[in-house]
């Protein structure tokens, strides 16, 4: 059996050291990070898994899977222009 340091083993295989520690995504919770436990529960039910919503919620919380929030869109600082001008109608008379 040959023992080598992690850096040397990665150099021999011509791989970056960071690829060794990276894990592939596993399961629907990792693949669909914008889904919360409710939507994930529906997906599991559609696939035929008889699973309770509370169990999915507990596992989701224990694995610290949170919904990735979308970044807020930066505005240019100007108010949007009105596409339809307001004018009084004759119905108000």
Swiss-Prot record:
InterPro entries assigned: HTH-like_dom
Q: Where are the transmembrane segments?
A: none
What is the protein's given name?
Insertion element ISR1 uncharacterized 11 kDa protein A1
* Positions of the UniProt region annotated as Disordered: 14-33, 68-93
**Pfam families associated with the record:** HTH_21
Keywords linked to the UniProt accession: Transposable element
Source taxonomy: Bacteria, Pseudomonadati, Pseudomonadota, Alphaproteobacteria, Hyphomicrobiales
């Amino acid at each position: 059996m040959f023992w080598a340091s992690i850096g040397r083993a990665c150099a021999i295989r011509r791989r970056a050291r960071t690829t060794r520690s990276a894990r592939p995504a596993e399961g629907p919770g990792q693949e669909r990070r914008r889904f919360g436990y409710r939507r994930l529960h529906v997906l599991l039910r559609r696939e035929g898994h008889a699973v309770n919503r509370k169990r999915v919620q507990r596992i989701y919380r224990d694995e610290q899977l949170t919904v990735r929030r979308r970044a807020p869109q930066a505005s240019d600082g100007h108010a949007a222009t009105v596409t339809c001008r307001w004018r009084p109608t004759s119905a108000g008379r």
